[in-house]
Design a protein with these regions (language model features):
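Conserved glycine-rich cofactor-binding loop
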Residues: 9-10
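Conserved NAD(P)H cofactor-binding loop of Rossmann-fold oxidoreductase domains
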Residues: 79-84
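C-terminal helical subdomain
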Residues: 171, 188-224
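Residue(s) in the substrate-gating loop at a strand-loop-helix junction
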Residues: 128
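Substrate-binding pocket helix/loop in short-chain dehydrogenase/reductase
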Residues: 87-88, 95-100
Length: 250
């Protein structure tokens, strides 16, 4: 049994690696930091390969696939990604395009390549509760990337189901999680964050049960349910105010 995890050096990805290792899975771990990956390797007893790749460079996505295509990989976890906070005029276009490359294009490349290979049993795409809403002022591009991940995963699930492919497709949509994401996005959440350990275990357990949409935490589930009934303009105003508070509490 073997799993490939991108963005594995910290946060949810790191905890997923540890949890799957405890379940007996050999691992292929990918992240930019070789030091963090090698440190994680020491904490896990199963066989591990590490690849220090910046996957926002899309050539590295293809290179990664070539490196591991002879392995029998059962689980693909597309976890690599990040967010940017700021008014549309403040965030640099190159930074936004880099985020799109990692959050969307990398995920799609790896998903497509491993599906074509025909060995994969589970794909877990890490999105966000942001991906289930109607837009995120002050994090507009990030919200849009996660909406893409959600909708791509939903459509892929149905296509594979109709073809009777025995492949589990799941999309993880957490609310606030206590990870380095907050520092990179330069925000601080007002809501209580879940631990990455809890989110990782919850997500993988639900993935094995072939749950399509995985939302950890009761409060987030309830919130997402009621948001569906709000008019779009009202929801955008509420979201803007919530985002602004993240900036004011840093």
């Amino acid at each position: 049994m073997k799993a490939l995890i991108t963005g594995a050096s910290s946060g949810i990805g790191r905890e997923m690696a540890k949890y799957l290792g405890n379940l007996g899975y050999d691992l292929i771990l990918v992240a930019r930091s070789a030091n963090k990956l090698n440190s994680l390797r020491k904490e896990i007893k199963t066989d591990i390969k590490v690849f220090s790749y910046d996957l926002s460079n899309l050539d590295n996505c293809y290179k990664l696939y070539e490196d591991v295509k002879n392995d029998t990989i059962d689980i693909l976890i597309n976890n690599a990604g990040y967010g940017l906070f700021g008014n549309y005029e403040e965030v640099l276009i190159d930074e936004e395009l880099n985020m799109i490359d990692l959050n969307i294009k990398c995920l799609q490349i790896l998903t497509k390549l491993f599906l074509k290979e025909g060995k994969i049993k589970y794909i877990l795409n890490v999105a966000s509760s942001a991906g289930l809403t109607k837009g995120g002022p002050l994090m507009s591009t990030y919200y849009a990337t996660k909406s893409y991940v959600c909708n791509y995963s939903f459509a892929l699930y149905e296509e594979l189901r109709r073809e009777n492919k025995n492949i589990g497709i799941s999309v993880l949509c957490p609310g606030p999680v206590d990870t380095n994401f907050n520092n990179r996005a330069n925000v601080k959440f007002n809501l209580k964050s879940l631990s990455p350990e809890y989110v990782a275990k919850y997500a993988i357990d639900k993935m094995f049960k072939r749950k399509l949409i995985i939302i950890p935490g009761l409060s987030v589930k309830i919130g997402m349910f009621f948001l569906k009934f709000l008019p779009t303009k009202t929801l955008l105003k509420i979201t803007y105010n919530m985002q602004e508070k993240k900036l004011s509490t840093k």
